[in-house]
């Protein structure tokens, strides 16, 4: 958190480092051991730092490789909640890592990618053929592209493509210069569920569709279901994509509405059993359920 080379390069928030060191010093003092000047010096340095509106968070994958994200320190920033990583994204990534055969050599479309944790983790561990990150808020898309680059995926000069997913939509094709043969084709797409058409979705042709924490409002639910119906309708001769949605159940009524609306349009669903242990550190209190949908 403080002296690790990764955290020195990409420091966590000032508040977090201050709290961490304060608690560590308390625990050290409670052992009656010799004081460690290094801890006090580090805390003094942090106390003199100004708070920033942005910080970094790093998560270690089972391989030991990190996923590092630049995040907002505020839950709501720039009129959106999409500039931080939510627990559902962590749990969906964990499920994907434990079930990587569902993604290997396949084209994945992520709806509501936010700042990119789930997709970056999948791209680093599950070896998809192609991965389409999507969102609709300009600030989120900008931060998403930055985080993809931050994790070793670099936008190739001259390879940026403009594909109309809505009137001002844009996709950015990215690749990793370090291992180009092993890495998926990456796309960042501006995607508005309400205005996108079946014709515009034809180019994507995903084998797998995923989303995390996108079921929180009745209007969003209807737009999401409409989006899934469009994806089902434009599959041409291919079979329908597999769909996995990680839902944080904050309001049971909203969750039940989602299930009822799925039933109403004939989209089947089942609850995927929860994993037994956590790969990433997250709050175990939120009730996150992963659903498989059959469109």
Show the residue positions of the predicted features.
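S-adenosylmethionine-dependent methyltransferases
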Residues: 1-295
């Amino acid at each position: 958190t403080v002296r690790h080379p990764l955290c020195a390069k990409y420091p966590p928030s000032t508040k977090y480092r201050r709290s961490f060191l304060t608690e560590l010093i308390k625990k050290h003092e409670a052992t009656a051991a010799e004081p460690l000047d290094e801890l006090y010096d580090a805390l003094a340095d942090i106390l003199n730092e100004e708070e920033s509106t942005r910080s970094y968070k790093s998560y270690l994958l089972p391989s030991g490789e990190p996923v590092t994200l630049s995040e907002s320190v505020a839950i709501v920033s720039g009129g959106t909640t999409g500039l931080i990583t939510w627990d559902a994204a962590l749990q969906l990534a964990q499920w994907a890592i434990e079930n990587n055969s569902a993604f290997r050599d396949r084209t994945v479309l992520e709806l509501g990618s936010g700042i990119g944790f789930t997709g970056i983790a999948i791209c680093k561990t599950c070896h998809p053929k192609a991965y389409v990150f999507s969102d609709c808020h300009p600030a989120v898309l900008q931060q998403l592209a930055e985080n993809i680059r931050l994790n070793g995926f670099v936008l190739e000069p001259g390879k940026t493509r403009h594909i109309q997913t809505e009137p001002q939509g844009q996709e950015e094709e990215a690749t990793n210069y370090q291992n180009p043969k092993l890495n998926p084709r990456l796309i960042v797409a501006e995607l508005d569920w309400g205005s996108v058409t079946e014709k515009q979705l034809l180019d994507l042709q995903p084998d797998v569709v995923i989303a995390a924490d996108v079921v929180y409002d009745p209007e969003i639910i209807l737009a999401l279901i409409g989006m899934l119906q469009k994806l089902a309708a434009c599959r041409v001769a291919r079979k329908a994509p597999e769909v996995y949605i990680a839902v944080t159940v904050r309001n049971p009524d909203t969750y039940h509405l989602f299930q009822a609306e799925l039933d109403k349009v004939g989209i089947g669903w089942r609850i995927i059993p929860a994993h037994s242990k956590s790969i990433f550190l997250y709050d175990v209190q939120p009730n996150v359920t992963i659903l498989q949908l059959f469109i």
